[in-house]
UniProtKB/Swiss-Prot annotation:
Leader sequence residues: 1-25
GO biological process, one term: bacterial-type flagellum-dependent cell motility
UniProt entry keywords in alphabetical sequence: Bacterial flagellum, Cell outer membrane, Lipoprotein, Membrane, Palmitate, Signal
GO CC field: bacterial-type flagellum basal body, distal rod, L ring; cell outer membrane
Record note on quaternary structure: The basal body constitutes a major portion of the flagellar organelle and consists of four rings (L,P,S, and M) mounted on a central rod.
Lipid metabolism keyword on record: no
Membrane association type: Lipid-anchor
Keyword Lipoprotein assigned: yes
Name of the protein in its database record: Flagellar L-ring protein
Record function comment: Assembles around the rod to form the L-ring and probably protects the motor/basal body from shearing forces during rotation.
Length: 229
């Protein structure tokens, strides 16, 4: 009868550890976009109406000549002038100094005078702490992007969002924008600055070799997760 030799438990554990490490390392860290709402919206189709036979034909798609041309409906477009310039500086410091001195004169009994004639105790302590810290950041983002009105709030404000994709060589660049626009801040050129947009979310990301070069490798991420230091 032929005997089958099974692998030892240590070998099985080592194989399982290697398999788990490989699976854990292959897992990519997803980068969730900060803008979760839809990037565009289409206006509802108007109800078909019989043409009255006159020059004036009412309807959703109609843009009267003497009416305000600023966006106000779902599906209208608006140009956002991105002009973000943020500078932040922070500094802090702490300084503590504490000193103490204590003396004790202990009287001794007469029969112990020869042994403890000078029983004087003294204690001196000092504690000093000094620390400083500072941080600074500067971010600048300029550009333009045309967005779409995705919702109209009850007070008339417009919820807008949009995305621009640019394929440069072998890298795909993404610019995403969303926020709430007050129609009164829209200029005659159908544009508004990003500094006038409430709840603005601006995202600039890319996909390609440059982005992959900036991403930590799977094996390095694995050892970084299990390293105790």
């Amino acid at each position: 009868m032929k005997q089958v030799r099974l692998p030892s438990s240590a070998t099985v554990r080592a194989a399982c550890a290697v398999a788990v490490a490989a699976l854990a390392g292959c897992a990519q860290i997803p980068r969730d976009p900060i803008i979760q709402q839809p990037m565009t919206a289409q206006p509802p189709m108007p109800m078909s109406m019989q043409a009255p036979g006159s020059i004036y034909n009412p309807g959703y798609a109609g843009r009267p000549l003497f009416e305000d041309q600023r966006p106000r409906n779902i599906g209208d477009i608006l140009t956002i002038m991105i002009a973000e310039n943020i500078n932040a500086t922070k500094s802090s410091g702490a300084n503590t100094n504490r000193q103490g001195n204590t003396d004790f004169n202990v009287p001794t009994a007469g029969f112990l005078g020869g042994l403890f004639a000078k029983a004087n105790l003294s204690a001196t302590g000092a504690n000093k702490f000094a620390a400083t810290g500072g941080a600074s950041a500067a971010n600048t983002f300029n550009g333009t992007i045309t967005v779409t009105v995705t919702n109209v709030l009850p007070n008339g404000n417009l919820v807008v969002s949009g995305e621009k994709q640019m394929l440069i060589n072998q890298g795909n660049e993404f610019v995403r924008f969303s926020g709430v626009v007050n129609p009164n801040t829209i200029s005659g050129a159908n544009s508004v600055y990003s500094t006038q947009v409430a709840d603005a979310k601006i995202e600039y990301s890319s996909k390609g070799y440059i982005n992959e070069a900036e991403t930590m490798g799977w094996l390095q991420r694995f050892f970084l997760n299990i390293a105790p230091w």
